[in-house]
Amino acid sequence: MSIMIIGLTGGIASGKSTVSKYLAEKGFKVYDADKIAKDISEKKSVQEEIISTFGNKILDKNGNIDRKKLKEIVFENKEKLEKLNGIIHPKVINFYKELKEKKTDKVIIFDVPLLFESGIDKFCDKILVVISDYEVQLNRIIERDKINRELAEKIIKSQLSNEERIKKADVVIENNSNLEDLFKKVERFCETI
């Protein structure tokens, strides 16, 4: 069976997850890298590796990893972010590699925020990028994640720029308007699959 793998990516708060959910509702098989990474990071062996790398300062009072503390640490320091990604990314990449080899569905969507940075784009036949203007993105993050502007800016700056993503994309969907407009654009994309 011939299989098409679509890599779906976009910066934080660009609307990528909304597009991902919409595609899943349309019946496409979607594999969300954030969920896969979260599941991987909850394995005891991986948690031990994260704690030994970042120390007890990332733990809450119950001895569990405090994701908010960890996020603040890794987005303050690029080397620390790379260390965390070095623990998680190889395991996520392996998951996608195994999935591609299984050839289970006709069309599979890899929903990966760091598609290019992780190298997962190499497994994809087509790349769909969702972008939003910087200020739109910033306001969405602040509202959604209840974080301050400074941390939101650091998170955006830690990722590839829209310009860099666009260069590597087969299809670009701009999401600066409302959901109805976004879904119309996704429908047009679906007609090309």
Swiss-Prot record:
InterPro entries according to UniProt: Depp_CoAkinase, P-loop_NTPase
Compartments reported by the entry: Cytoplasm
Keyword Nucleotide-binding: yes
Keyword Metal-binding among UniProt keywords: no
Main localisation: cytoplasm
Catalytic activity annotation: 3'-dephospho-CoA + ATP = ADP + CoA + H(+)
Pathway(s) of this molecule: Cofactor biosynthesis; coenzyme A biosynthesis; CoA from (R)-pantothenate: step 5/5
EC assignment: 2.7.1.24
Pfam families: CoaE
Binding site for ATP: 13-18
GO terms of molecular function: ATP binding; dephospho-CoA kinase activity
GO cellular component: cytoplasm
Record keywords: ATP-binding, Coenzyme A biosynthesis, Cytoplasm, Kinase, Nucleotide-binding, Transferase
Residue ranges constituting the DPCK domain according to the UniProt record: 5-193
SUPFAM superfamilies (alphabetical): P-loop containing nucleoside triphosphate hydrolases
Biological processes annotated in GO: coenzyme A biosynthetic process
Family to which the UniProt record says this protein belongs: Belongs to the CoaE family.
PANTHER family the record matches: BIFUNCTIONAL COENZYME A SYNTHASE-RELATED, DEPHOSPHO-COA KINASE-RELATED
Its biological purpose: Catalyzes the phosphorylation of the 3'-hydroxyl group of dephosphocoenzyme A to form coenzyme A.
UniProt name for this protein: Dephospho-CoA kinase
Organism whose genome encodes this protein: Fusobacterium nucleatum subsp. nucleatum (strain ATCC 25586 / DSM 15643 / BCRC 10681 / CIP 101130 / JCM 8532 / KCTC 2640 / LMG 13131 / VPI 4355)
